[in-house]
């Protein structure tokens, strides 16, 4: 399964009913929609999947619904970040038991660990399971903890299961180059809403793992790049850059993403669980204007 961990992995939000319950039909519809977009796989229960707001039972429900809808030949990566090593191991084992192709793990933020502590944490998780661990390097989500290039390279050298990186430490293209130079065997995914996807590819990334609500656009960029049509990839990227930038605004990116999926008829409501940053009518009007200008209103194809 590790050979399939490349290309575009769309990170999906967790759909809720208006009363806050998991919306099973929307989870299935979102999975079908994402697969139909042509992505290489999906990632669930990440930061914008509101994983921290779910109970253990709800995590299992989302995993079961997604993995069943995806089918056995479509890889699902599951976020299993936890503040403690034992907790992360338990979540990762559970994801493997339920059929996950890989897990995604960010640094445990409460302990403010150094490189040695992070090495021990990740090795313990990797040794406890038989599937790849995507190391998430995203300082804003973990209290500012930054992973050094040496640590990342060392993780990949220690075991092939840790030779996967979701790099979101800005400026990401520069760090892609640095990690590639330190350990060329590491498979690097970009993130950050896709904002630097083209540049990350230029610097050696193998794809992107992010939640942009028009995954078919990221797929088109990636396929053009993979075919050798670098100008074509750039043309697509620069056309849709305004939307990528708009959707990935700090604090409101979750709300915007859910509103877009709702407008596209993929999820029944844009409901997020409290606490979250809502968007106002003016921002939604800006979104509608942008979608109209890019011919991306509901029912249209990118």
Language-model features and meaning:
Residues 2-146, 154, 261:
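Active-site beta->alpha loop and helix N-cap motifs at the rims of alpha/beta catalytic domains
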């Amino acid at each position: 399964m590790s050979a399939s961990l490349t290309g575009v992995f769309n990170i999906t939000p967790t759909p809720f009913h208006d009363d806050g319950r998991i919306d099973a039909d929307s989870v299935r519809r979102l999975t079908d929609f994402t697969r139909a977009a042509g992505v290489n796989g999906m990632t669930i229960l990440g930061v914008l999947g509101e994983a921290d707001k779910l109970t253990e039972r709800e995590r299992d429900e989302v995993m079961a619904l997604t993995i069943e809808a995806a089918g056995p030949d479509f890889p699902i990566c599951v976020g299993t970040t936890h503040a403690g090593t034992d907790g992360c191991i338990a979540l990762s084992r559970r994801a493997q038991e339920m059929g996950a192709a890989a897990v995604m793990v960010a640094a445990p933020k409460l302990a403010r660990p150094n490189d040695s502590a992070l090495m021990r944490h990740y090795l313990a998780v990797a040794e406890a399971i038989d599937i790849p661990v995507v190391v998430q390097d995203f300082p804003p989500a973990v209290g500012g903890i930054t992973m050094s290039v040496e640590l990342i390279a060392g993780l990949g050298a220690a075991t092939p299961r840790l030779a996967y990186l979701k790099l979101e430490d800005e400026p990401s293209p520069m760090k892609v180059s640095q990690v590639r130079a330190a350990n060329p065997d590491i498979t690097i995914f970009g993130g950050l809403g896709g904002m630097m996807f083209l540049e990350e590819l230029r610097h050696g990334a193998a794809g992107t793992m992010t939640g942009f609500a028009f995954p078919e656009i990221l797929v088109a960029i990636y396929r053009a790049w993979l075919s050798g049509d670098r100008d074509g990839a750039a043309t697509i990227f620069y056309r849709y850059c305004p939307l990528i930038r708009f959707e990935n605004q700090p604090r409101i990116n979750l709300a915007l993403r859910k509103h877009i999926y709702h407008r596209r008829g993929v999820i029944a409501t844009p409901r997020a669980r409290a606490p979250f940053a809502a968007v106002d009518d003016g921002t939604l009007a800006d979104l509608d204007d942008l979608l109209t200008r890019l011919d991306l209103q509901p029912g249209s194809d990118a």
